[in-house]
Amino acid sequence: MNQEEWIAELKGIQPALFEGLRRMVAIPSIRGEAEDGAPFGKGPRQALDEVLAIASELGFQTKNIDNKIGYAQYGEDRPDGAYYGIFGHVDVMPLGEGWISPALDLTVRDGRLYGRGTLDNKGPILSNLYALYVLKEKGVTFDRPVRIVFGTNEETGFGCVKHYLTKEIPPTFGWTPDCKWPVVYGERGRLRVRLSVSSDKVSGLYTFANEKLLHTNHRGEELGIAYEDSDFGMMQLRGETFGVEDGRHYVEWTMCYPAS
């Protein structure tokens, strides 16, 4: 298939995507008191059940992990357990004030979608689910299964993902289509770097940090990695921290591009 044909397929699935999103937006999946079978409250549990039902209707394998998190999977398990992971969440923040249209009723107005969770994160994670559905229906295969993982506690602590990682191995590769995805995700770059040394070389570590990180313009020139362009401006280095772990001294810093 060429690009135009893929675009046509994606446009064709939009009505089904909007209907799925309507079902999800209608659920007030705000964290509540823990109950039997609903560790983060009734709303998040209901949202998890609903999104797994949607995924099942689309022909995906699904799994609910202790009512805290679940996933839809395309492709069979490998002996080594490796998979690609797309992580999102179906819990939302409280509805708040000032809604022009009903917060729990998906509204299309002037080509835009309104409703709690359309941006963070029900809309983006469902977009990935339906895009994967198109690939599945067209017979596209991958060298390992693809999972779309639906958390229920992202807004209040990530307890869902922490629990997931006690039951499942981390993905080989993946992404998080959260918030204004893919625009913001594509525009922002973050890299957290750690440099560690044994205790007998700690003097050199602090010399490096002073000369290359702390007493600089924080643009990476001393490291030979300075970069800027007209669209995103200058890369910046910041967030330097020092510590000791497992007997090794380290310095960490963040490379930010763009800086905002």
Predicted features, each with a name:
Residues 2-85, 89-96:
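N-terminal helical capping/dimerization or prosegment-like subdomains
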Residues 62, 106, 239-242:
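A structural signal for short hydrophobic beta-strand segments in well-ordered beta-sheet cores
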Residues 67-68, 88-90, 110, 152-153, ...:
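Fold-independent oxyanion-binding glycine-rich loops
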Residues 70, 112-113, 249:
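Hydrophobic residues embedded in beta-strands of well-ordered beta-sheets
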Residues 76, 90, 152, 255-257:
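Short beta-strand segments enriched in hydrophobic/aromatic residues
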Residues 80-150:
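Active-site metal-coordination/substrate-binding segment of hydrolases
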Residues 121-197:
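Acidic/histidine-rich catalytic neighborhood of metal-dependent amide-processing enzymes
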Residues 162-260:
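Midchain, well-structured core segments that form catalytic/ion-binding scaffolds
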